[in-house]
Amino acid sequence: MLSFLQNPRQAAAQVLNFALILSTAFMMWKGLSVASDSPSPIVVVLSGSMEPAFQRGDLLFLWNRNLLEETKVGEIVVYNVKGKDIPIVHRLVRKFGAGPKAKLLTKGDNNVADDTELYARGQDYIEREDIIGSVVGYIPFVGYVTILLSEHPWLKTVMLGMMGLVVVLQRE
């Protein structure tokens, strides 16, 4: 069962394989960030505020390279609110002015009111600099795993334990 302890070369190879997988995932994430010009090129929909367009758990792909083009009313954007860590996925419903200093108002498709209550205190609108990216594609329900892991922390422990067990018991 613990035969990997008897063969340090095999144990080192398994550790290096695991490190290779982690570094590859990190490089892919950073590559997507640079290509899309977005700090978070992939986000998960955390609430039902954008139904029926997007369901809770949908994985969204963002693009932020259209800096020369104006953000258009009707676009679905992901933006950060000053002082809050969770990005919000909502539709741009009104625009005041033009250019990088235009004032933007957003609203969830499934919400009755606009997002002024979600913005930071004293902030009535968001600006282009608050936008992380525009949604260019999605995969339904794939992000639900991250929601489950954040809502049920014990699942992280179970999952990490199972992954560790697989690494320990794996034979080459």
Swiss-Prot record:
Residues 158-169 are annotated as: C-terminal short (CTS) helix. GO terms for biological process: protein targeting to ER; signal peptide processing. It catalyses: Cleavage of hydrophobic, N-terminal signal or leader sequences from secreted and periplasmic proteins. InterPro entries: LexA/Signal_pep-like_sf, Pept_S26A_signal_pept_1_Ser-AS, Peptidase_S26, Peptidase_S26B. The keyword Transmembrane applies. Keywords: Endoplasmic reticulum, Hydrolase, Membrane, Protease, Signal-anchor, Transmembrane, Transmembrane helix. Residues 1-14 are cytoplasmic. It is an enzyme of class 3 (hydrolase). Its EC number is 3.4.21.89. The chain crosses the membrane at residues 15-35. It is a single-pass type II membrane protein. The active site is at S49 (charge relay system), H90 (charge relay system), D115 (charge relay system). GO terms for cellular component: signal peptidase complex. Belongs to the peptidase S26B family. Catalytic component of the signal peptidase complex (SPC) which catalyzes the cleavage of N-terminal signal sequences from nascent proteins as they are translocated into the lumen of the endoplasmic reticulum. Specifically cleaves N-terminal signal peptides that contain a hydrophobic alpha-helix (h-region) shorter than 18-20 amino acids. The C-terminal short (CTS) helix is essential for catalytic activity. It may be accommodated as a transmembrane helix in the thinned membrane environment of the complex, similarly to the signal peptide in the complex substrates. This is Signal peptidase complex catalytic subunit sec11. It comes from Sclerotinia sclerotiorum (strain ATCC 18683 / 1980 / Ss-1) (White mold). The gene is sec11.
